[in-house]
């Protein structure tokens, strides 16, 4: 970031496709929090489901692979952010959480809800497929989720989730997190803070290179 940048600089919009059960999405979210402390940004969270409804049961090989890489990611999160990972159930569906997120967005609380769900799953071992868990998280933000929202039957939130998923397809987003800065720069994966900062500066029009 340019050191002369004023704190009144217009925030850079960052569209983020993310899934709550993705460890790299937790890292990406934490790095966005770090970025927000350095330069004005406006994260807009979009739904992405690594295991959409109708996915086959997770194979034993996939579960073993997740169990193998989890300690490495846990160590990275501990060393970089000082947080202890206590993961929720492997294979938990994020369907209801994404629909709840769109309800939270309508009330101006998407960022807070996103952060709360990520922390509930990754740091508190909660099952975010459990509607009672989501309702409890929502209550901390003065949000109430009825069955229609959490079951994907509420038309407005269901349409918003569908639009997010369709946009991801249109942009050829096949993995998350994925960041689009001001509709100009695309960054894929849990990249270092320095790269996100360069992307934000470039989106703002400052003379930096983004790779």
Language-model features, listed with the residues they occupy:
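C-terminal cap of thioredoxin/glutaredoxin-like
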Residues: 2-7, 11-12, 24-38, 116-211
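Short pre-active-site segment immediately N-terminal to redox-active cysteine/selenocysteine motifs
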Residues: 18-21
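Short, well-ordered beta-strand elements
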Residues: 12-16, 44
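Structural alpha/beta surface segment adjacent to cysteine/selenocysteine redox centers
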Residues: 26-124, 206, 210
């Amino acid at each position: 970031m340019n050191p002369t940048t004023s704190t009144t600089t217009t925030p850079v919009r960052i569209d983020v496709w993310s899934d709550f059960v993705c460890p790299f999405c937790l890292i990406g979210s934490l790095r966005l929090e770090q970025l927000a402390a350095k330069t004005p940004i406006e994260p807009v969270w979009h739904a992405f489901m690594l295991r959409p409804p109708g996915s086959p049961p997770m194979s034993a090989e996939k579960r073993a692979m997740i169990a193998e890489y989890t300690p490495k990611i846990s160590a990275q999160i501990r060393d970089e952010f000082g947080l202890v990972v206590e993961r929720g159930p492997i294979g938990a569906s994020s369907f209801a959480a994404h629909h709840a997120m769109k309800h939270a967005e309508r009330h101006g609380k998407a960022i807070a809800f996103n952060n709360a769900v990520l922390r509930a799953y990754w740091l508190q071992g909660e099952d975010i497929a459990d509607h009672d868990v989501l309702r409890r998280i929502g209550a901390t933000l003065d949000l109430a989720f009825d069955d229609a929202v959490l079951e994907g039957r509420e038309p407005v939130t269901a349409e918003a989730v569908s639009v997010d998923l369709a946009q991801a397809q249109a942009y050829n987003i096949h993995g998350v997190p994925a960041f689009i800065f001001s509709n100009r720069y695309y960054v894929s994966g849990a990249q270092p803070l320095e790269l996100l900062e360069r992307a934000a500066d470039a989106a703002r029009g400052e003379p930096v290179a983004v790779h």
